[in-house]
Amino acid sequence: MFLTNLLMTIAPVLLAVAFLTLVERKILGYMQLRKGPIVVGPYGLLQPISDAVKLFTKEPLRPLTSSTTMFLMAPTLALALALTMWIPLPMPLPLTNMNLSLLFMLAMSSLAVYAILWSGWASNSNYALIGALRAVAQTISYEVTLAIILLSVLLLSGSYSLSTLIITQEYMWLILPSWPLAMMWFISTLAETNRAPFDLTEGESELVSGFNVEYAGGPFALFFLAEYTNIIMMNALTTILFLGAYNNPNTPELYTINFTTKTLLLTMAFLWIRASYPRFRYDQLMHLLWKNFLPLTLALCMWYTALPIITAAIPPQT
């Protein structure tokens, strides 16, 4: 039964990822006053399927000097970790109800760094290695603020479980009392998923393609899938943390529709940002985090810790 549930979670996610690539190309196309893909199928709707067929039927080329095992393990690990992070997400019921689901997701996203590092190191290419080192530094740095923001949200909800956040936000979204946190969280998720304007790992002008420069065909497709799975997952997590919907146990499908709509809108915002903003310089990226976000998130975390203690002294208003 668990395997059936797992497949019923993973299959729609992979399908959503496939069509997210099409949505991205269409949105970027219309923003640049062109049509985007229109050849394969009606309105280009079958483009993701043809892309998948093309990538997986190509010969998986491998550099002679690369470390074979690690070279092939890295993309597999990247996708496996990206899909594992969907397990504790309540939609409205999670696949397994963990008490420490937020910690689990944080741990999984930290492990994703290894896949990137292995791919850059095993490729035995300078471009790939520089791209991987950048990605690792960026991901580890932004995880610091993500963890502190999560801690602040946990202080507001009072539990490490994601399901509790649905009850916490029954009457009011957490984005309203903690909007600075939500803004910093959204920008940090952009950096965490290596999206524009933080896509320094894939700086085409300087690194050709970043850590996946030596990959082609199937392994490249796995990296691609992992990246877009992480994007949707991060937006789903943002929805649960800050835009939680009321879940009526009699009509759970209403929650699911609400949840997916918000996730879709946030993903559209990701694509819109990509079309609008130029890439940051590397020192600006690090400066933004260590000099701006970190002090702010720490101060806000202390504030949310102190707030219940301060208000506990106020006599009840009758």
Curated annotation (Swiss-Prot):
Gene it is expressed from: MT-ND1
EC numbers on record: 7.1.1.2
GO terms assigned for molecular function: NADH dehydrogenase (ubiquinone) activity
GO annotation terms (biological process): aerobic respiration
Role played: Core subunit of the mitochondrial membrane respiratory chain NADH dehydrogenase (Complex I) that is believed to belong to the minimal assembly required for catalysis. Complex I functions in the transfer of electrons from NADH to the respiratory chain. The immediate electron acceptor for the enzyme is believed to be ubiquinone.
Localization: Mitochondrion inner membrane
Top-level taxonomic group: Eukaryota
Substrates-to-products reaction catalysed: a ubiquinone + NADH + 5 H(+)(in) = a ubiquinol + NAD(+) + 4 H(+)(out)
Regions crossing the membrane: 2-22, 70-90, 102-122, 147-167, 171-191, 222-242, 253-273, 294-314
The name this protein goes by in its record: NADH-ubiquinone oxidoreductase chain 1
